[in-house]
């Protein structure tokens, strides 16, 4: 908060016209005023004041009263003035803080001074006659030393599919090792430290790297990583479209104005992990999911009860200011891609029904990778007490006990917030997929639908990331590979996600016949949008086969003179370690079977390996133990 204090012989103001839509109702404060011997406090409320307004107001009021006493003023006038800083608080917050300041000054000194406040958000004319003594013109800058934090008291339970309720401590002996790890971390505060995570090595091996010229927690995506990011994004959309409800796909911006009340209120609920910036005198927040953009669109739609349920999907360019010491490749990032799906439902009961389809997809996609989810249900106290039957229905669908965290009602926008955790190869619970039942944001953003009686209602909004963020899904894929190797299997990634799906290796790259055969096979595969390349480098066959294995290519096909004569290729299949001689059409069928139900994304690399520069990240030898 910045203030300019003028000790005035005379001060007169009159409101002229509204300056902003959020202007204060002048019926509540004086629309005009005339004062003699007044300390006029020209006051700018800044964005930083909103983190702990109580401390700022108390500090400012105490100082203002002391100054008024020193100069011998008869009246203190709090006068909103937006010109002392470029970093303004949102209007609705500034208005509240100015009212708090007026009340605090009255509380401290109503027996000594008259206290008045001019209306906020108006253009005003004023006349000022300054005394001109040494203390008649002063400026002050008030800042909270601490950020106000409200400690949220939580209760923890374990709820079984049979409806039994346990304390976390009671259930530990019954829990599987993986669920025990979830309970210990989430409910008992036990952290696993000092364990090197082999998944980080795989992320780096496939070209997921930190960008040293950016902020902490920002990644760059090399060609292999870029392909994987694009493929997972396409797959997330395929899953959204597979739902039995209509889903719209949209795109939007990545920053929103905190001066807008719904944006500010939603951000305040999110907490202190916001990326904020100032531009053109505006205080902006980088979005942390797709909520702002999708809700801004949905508020403009004309919605009937017949339109619901209705989904909206976007891959949101998302930003969260995670602590620099906690960022982890592909998992905890400051900038990431979130395939965010929001579904409008008519009621919480309808949302529970819709969630059945979501839960099936969430569990199925983890199981495809050989992973198992363990659920943490964050619920409000009123939902826990009054709608436990609905909660039990959700837990029964998961098919295993769930950890329940009960929060006081009314502090968040959701009544149910479900986190699905895997326990990774380092023994740490990792949240991947999620869904929530949101009962607050429809009203906050003005999203309405009309029922069969032509009455308006606010829908319940389901938030879900069916496979988590794109990077976290890839983390889960790599973690599954680490677990494979520990079981004695050859680690692999699914064919649809492999940057190169087939590599053709002529035994003699100088042989026109072998190279021609490889090119014909490549053309056949490419016509079906299969990612294939040809290793035509003048290196030994053994070296080129090892390089292909280092890239975890699912199908490595060697072509020699015999293959040219017989019209075949000699294929090594990574997943099974089988080696087979097949016709090109048979190889095509093998790959197409792997790709059934998955996206086809064009390669991010040249067809010929000889045309690549040296990709340093591929040269790394990775031991997963």
UniProtKB/Swiss-Prot annotation:
Residues 1-149 are annotated as: Editing domain. Keywords: Aminoacyl-tRNA synthetase, ATP-binding, Cytoplasm, Ligase, Metal-binding, Nucleotide-binding, Protein biosynthesis, RNA-binding, tRNA-binding, Zinc. PROSITE patterns: AA_TRNA_LIGASE_II (PS50862). It is found in: Cytoplasm. GO terms for molecular function: ATP binding; threonine-tRNA ligase activity; tRNA binding; zinc ion binding. Its EC number is 6.1.1.3. Residues 197-494, 198-494 are annotated as: Catalytic. Its main location: cytoplasm. Binds 1 zinc ion per subunit. Transmembrane segments: none annotated. The keyword Aminoacyl-tRNA synthetase applies. Its cofactor is Zn(2+). It comes from the Archaea. It catalyses: tRNA(Thr) + L-threonine + ATP = L-threonyl-tRNA(Thr) + AMP + diphosphate + H(+). One of its GO terms (biological process) is threonyl-tRNA aminoacylation. GO terms for cellular component: cytoplasm. Zn(2+) binds at residues 291, 342, 463. Pfam families: HGTP_anticodon, tRNA-synt_2b, tRNA-Thr_ED. It is an enzyme of class 6 (ligase). Catalyzes the attachment of threonine to tRNA(Thr) in a two-step reaction: L-threonine is first activated by ATP to form Thr-AMP and then transferred to the acceptor end of tRNA(Thr). Also edits incorrectly charged L-seryl-tRNA(Thr). HAMAP family: Thr_tRNA_synth. The N-terminal domain is an archaea-specific tRNA-editing domain that hydrolyzes incorrectly charged L-seryl-tRNA(Thr). Catalysis of tRNA editing is performed by the charged tRNA itself. Homodimer. Belongs to the class-II aminoacyl-tRNA synthetase family. This is Threonine--tRNA ligase. It comes from Hyperthermus butylicus (strain DSM 5456 / JCM 9403 / PLM1-5). The lineage of its organism: Archaea, Thermoproteota, Thermoprotei, Desulfurococcales, Pyrodictiaceae.
